[in-house]
């Protein structure tokens, strides 16, 4: 029998319009369900359901809302963060931690796959990630305006390939982001490559430390066991090795023009974001470089 709290949480976090609007019913066979059901308890689902989607909050606020002790809510939020169901950051005036209930992609699906022990134990999480990187776009892509409206990833050209005679915006340069987040760099295993490996698919890419986390997301990854800190020089070595292997640099595109949380180094045969641009022609128009001519 399906667990109703997991059904409710899957519906809350999904980007699939028919399910979000209640036009179709979420079932045990849907990825939103089986991806969460294997790792989220009913008590954890209660806390997540008390949170607003993509709106930072604190254990104190949720505890008051639920009528529960702060220590109880704090532990559950930390456990969900370790599992990858929640994110947290320190983007507050006083640098205190705030928690976020994310959407699945980009968000919880990647983070759940970055918990290597968890996804090895529950390989259905890999399939859940693959499906959630595809299914929502089958309905929403035709409605996406030029620029992407925050959906997906943004391709960054190899810096030396930008002609010196062109005026290019600073965000088109990897160096801009490394400088902006100097001292706040981390690296973790690629969730796409890991998911494809576990599904027995992809292009045989090695599972390696290729996803560079920046800002307080780097701290989140380190504190929850999903990555480690790196220096500016090590980041440059990872980027150089990626270019030598023909990988594509991509940055996150969900938080506005001058804020990112990751620099990914993607292989066409394993990256779900690059796959999307091949499957959905409309998607290409908002993945192109913003280099000014």
Residue ranges and their predicted role:
Residues 38, 68, 99-101, 252-258, ...:
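Ferredoxin-like iron-sulfur electron-transfer modules
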Residues 66-82:
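Short amphipathic alpha-helical interaction segments
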Residues 39-45:
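Short helix-coil-helix linker/hinge
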Residues 81-92:
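A short, conserved structural fragment
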Residues 54-66:
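Short acidic, hydrophobic short linear motifs in intrinsically disordered regions
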Residues 123-230, 252-256:
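Long, Pro/Ser/Thr-rich low-complexity/intrinsically disordered regulatory tracts in eukaryotic proteins
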Residues 1-33:
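Long, low-complexity, charged/polar intrinsically disordered regions in eukaryotic proteins
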Residues 94-135:
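Short, amphipathic alpha-helical interaction segments positioned at domain boundaries
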């Amino acid at each position: 029998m399906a667990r109703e709290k997991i059904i409710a949480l899957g519906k809350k976090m999904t980007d699939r319009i028919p399910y979000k609007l209640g036009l179709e019913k979420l079932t045990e066979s849907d990825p939103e369900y089986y991806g969460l059901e294997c790792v989220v308890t009913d008590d954890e689902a209660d806390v997540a359901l008390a949170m607003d989607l993509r709106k930072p909050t604190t254990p104190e606020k949720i505890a008051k809302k639920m009528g529960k002790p702060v220590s109880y809510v704090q532990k559950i939020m930390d456990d969900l963060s370790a599992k990858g169901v929640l994110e947290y950051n320190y983007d507050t005036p006083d640098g205190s931690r705030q928690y976020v209930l994310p959407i699945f992609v980009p968000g919880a699906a990647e983070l759940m796959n970055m918990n290597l022990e968890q996804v090895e134990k529950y390989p259905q999480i890999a399939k859940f990630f693959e499906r959630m990187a595809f299914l929502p776009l089958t309905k929403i892509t035709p409605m996406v305006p030029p620029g992407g409206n925050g959906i997906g990833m943004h391709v960054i050209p190899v810096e030396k390939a930008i002609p010196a005679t062109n005026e290019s915006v600073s965000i088109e340069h990897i160096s801009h982001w490394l400088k902006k987040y100097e001292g706040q760099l981390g690296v973790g295993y690629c969730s796409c490559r890991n998911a494809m490996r576990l599904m027995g698919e992809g292009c045989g890419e090695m599972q390696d430390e290729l996803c560079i986390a920046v800002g307080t997301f780097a701290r989140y990854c380190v504190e929850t066991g999903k990555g480690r800190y790196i220096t500016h020089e090590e980041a440059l070595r990872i980027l150089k090795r990626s270019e030598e292997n023909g990988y594509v640099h991509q940055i996150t595109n969900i938080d506005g023009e001058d804020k990112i949380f990751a620099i990914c180094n993607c292989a066409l045969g394993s990256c779900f974001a690059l796959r999307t641009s091949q499957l959905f022609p409309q998607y290409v128009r908002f993945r192109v470089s913003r280099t000014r001519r």
